């Protein structure tokens, strides 16, 4: 991370208290049971399982009430702040239950009318959304990015609750994720919005996610773009006025909205671009007064973002390509899914990277396949998370082409797919 990016850890408080264990309870869509009744029965379940080892999910229950009303009970995010899974004694922890039901409907469009055109200015989700279920867990990062982002938003709510004078201590509720394309910045923003809606379900009845289509807000008559930005944020203000809702505003590729003033002065951008920058900054200053809004932004080209916008971001987090250790976790989750679906058959146990470390990476019948996966992970360094998630599909399509395959055969195909990916890159760079 470059020097211009503040240390995320320094921006967040360290609280020395009894650990809190978060338990997410996915209530069935058709269930009409009261949340308090669901929580009561889940606590009975947890009382029978005082000791758990890291994250854990129940999907089958002995209790008929849970079978009828609950899809799953998950102990989550225990590994965000510790490197290795640890036994957890629930009787010594504060257990926070978060009961939620997923909204099955997809996104709706927010339109702005401009003369004869109807501009799709944003996509709008009601959270928690079925579309984003499981997205948080699928994102793998080396640093404590996910836990720090969660802590940041919780801190903004704490400061608002305690009526901290924002003239003395400022926070703008703006997060900027920047880094190369394909590293999962936009997905992380959506997953964070979903996670926080669930985490804060006792405080807010639902969440709203507005993904602004930055490019569509640039009118073909450039001078009108500032007005479009203002109208877009007025629509968002209507959502913020509902205090039962936690509102997330996602601006993807924010550099397209905040074209640097320097470029305007140099004559490489139209002078009307300054009006767009000013409109965005003014609207952010307007909505930051509200405690139920968080602005999430991403950028692939940090250098093009207006300095005044960067200064408004409380957290500027670099999101880079995954390391070999993170790649191993990504591949492992892909293999588990393919074994669950019986595309890889028969199922075989794979060791985690931590378990390989504990045996000193010694090769034997138990560790052989996991060591091969570790080797494939190392040679995959440099590939983005987006590409890595696609490689198992490409491996099957290009080198297997059969309904089922052994894990040995699949790992060989995956290795070939990685080699081909780098070869294709080399050819493209030569064009």
Swiss-Prot record:
Q: Can you supply one Gene Ontology CC term for this chain's record?
A: nucleus
Q: Which InterPro entries match?
A: AAA+_ATPase, ATPase_AAA_core, ATPase_AAA_CS, ClpA/B, P-loop_NTPase, Pch2-like
> Mind telling me which Gene3D superfamilies this protein's record contains?
P-loop containing nucleotide triphosphate hydrolases
Q: Which GO terms describe its molecular function?
A: ATP binding; ATP hydrolysis activity
Q: Which residues carry this modification: N-acetylmethionine?
A: 1
Q: Which residues does the record give as ATP binding sites?
A: 179-186
One matching Pfam family? AAA
Q: Which UniProt keywords apply?
A: Acetylation, ATP-binding, Differentiation, Meiosis, Nucleotide-binding, Oogenesis, Spermatogenesis
Q: What are the recorded Gene Ontology BP terms?
A: double-strand break repair; meiotic recombination checkpoint signaling; mitotic spindle assembly checkpoint signaling; oogenesis; reciprocal meiotic recombination; spermatogenesis; synaptonemal complex assembly
Supply the PROSITE patterns for this chain.
AAA
Explain the purpose of this protein. Answer: Plays a key role in chromosome recombination and chromosome structure development during meiosis. Required at early steps in meiotic recombination that leads to non-crossovers pathways. Also needed for efficient completion of homologous synapsis by influencing crossover distribution along the chromosomes affecting both crossovers and non-crossovers pathways. Also required for development of higher-order chromosome structures and is needed for synaptonemal-complex formation. In males, required for efficient synapsis of the sex chromosomes and for sex body formation.
Give the family this protein belongs to, as stated in its UniProt record: Belongs to the AAA ATPase family. PCH2 subfamily.
Give the quaternary structure: Specifically interacts with the ligand binding domain of the thyroid receptor (TR). This interaction does not require the presence of thyroid hormone for its interaction. Interacts with proteasome subunit PSMA8; to participate in meiosis progression during spermatogenesis.
Query: What is the protein name for this chain?
Result: Pachytene checkpoint protein 2 homolog
Per the UniProt entry, what species is this protein from, by scientific name? Sus scrofa (Pig)
Tell me the name of the encoding gene.
Answer: TRIP13
């Amino acid at each position: 991370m470059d020097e211009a990016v503040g240390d995320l850890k320094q921006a967040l408080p360290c609280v020395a208290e009894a650990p809190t264990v978060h338990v997410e309870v996915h209530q069935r869509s058709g269930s009409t049971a009261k949340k308090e009744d669901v929580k009561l029965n889940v606590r009975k379940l947890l009382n029978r399982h005082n000791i758990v080892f890291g994250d854990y999910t129940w999907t089958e229950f002995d209790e008929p009430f849970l079978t009828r009303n609950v899809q799953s009970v998950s102990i989550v995010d225990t590994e965000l702040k510790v490197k290795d899974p640890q036994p957890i004694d629930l009787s010594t922890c504060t257990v926070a239950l978060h009961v939620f039901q997923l909204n099955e409907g997809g996104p709706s469009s927010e339109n702005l009318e401009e003369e004869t055109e109807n501009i799709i200015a944003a996509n709008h989700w009601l959270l928690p959304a079925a579309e984003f279920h499981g997205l948080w867990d699928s994102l793998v990062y080396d640093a404590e990015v996910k836990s720090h982002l969660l802590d940041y938003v919780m801190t903004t709510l704490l400061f608002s609750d305690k009526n901290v004078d924002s003239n003395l201590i400022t926070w703008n509720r703006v997060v900027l994720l920047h880094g190369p394309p394909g590293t999962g910045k936009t997905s992380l923003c959506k997953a964070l919005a979903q996670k926080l809606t669930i985490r804060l379900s006792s405080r807010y009845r639902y969440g709203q996610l507005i993904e602004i289509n930055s490019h569509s807000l640039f009118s073909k008559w450039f001078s009108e773009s500032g007005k479009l930005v203002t109208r877009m944020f007025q629509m968002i203000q209507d959502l913020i006025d509902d205090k039962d809702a936690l509102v997330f505003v996602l601006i993807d590729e924010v550099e397209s909205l905040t074209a640097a003033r320097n470029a305007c002065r140099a004559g490489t951008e139209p002078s009307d671009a300054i009006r767009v920058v000013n409109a965005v900054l003014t609207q952010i200053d307007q909505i930051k007064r509200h405690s139920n809004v968080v602005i999430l932004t991403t950028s692939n080209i940090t250098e093009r973002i207006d300095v005044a916008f960067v200064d408004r971001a409380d957290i500027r987090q670099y999101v880079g390509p995954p390391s070999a250790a993170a790649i191993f976790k990504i591949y492992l989750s892909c293999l588990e899914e393919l074994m669950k679906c019986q595309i890889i058959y028969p199922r075989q146990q794979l060791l985690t990277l931590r378990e390989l470390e504990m045996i000193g990476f010694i090769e034997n019948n138990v560790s052989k396949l996991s060591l091969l996966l570790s080797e494939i992970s190392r040679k995959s360094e440099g590939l983005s998370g987006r590409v890595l998630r696609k490689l198992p599909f490409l491996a099957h399509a290009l080198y297997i082409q059969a309904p089922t395959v052994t894990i040995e055969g699949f790992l060989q195909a995956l290795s070939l797919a990685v080699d081909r990916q780098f070869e294709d890159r080399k050819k493209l760079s030569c064009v």
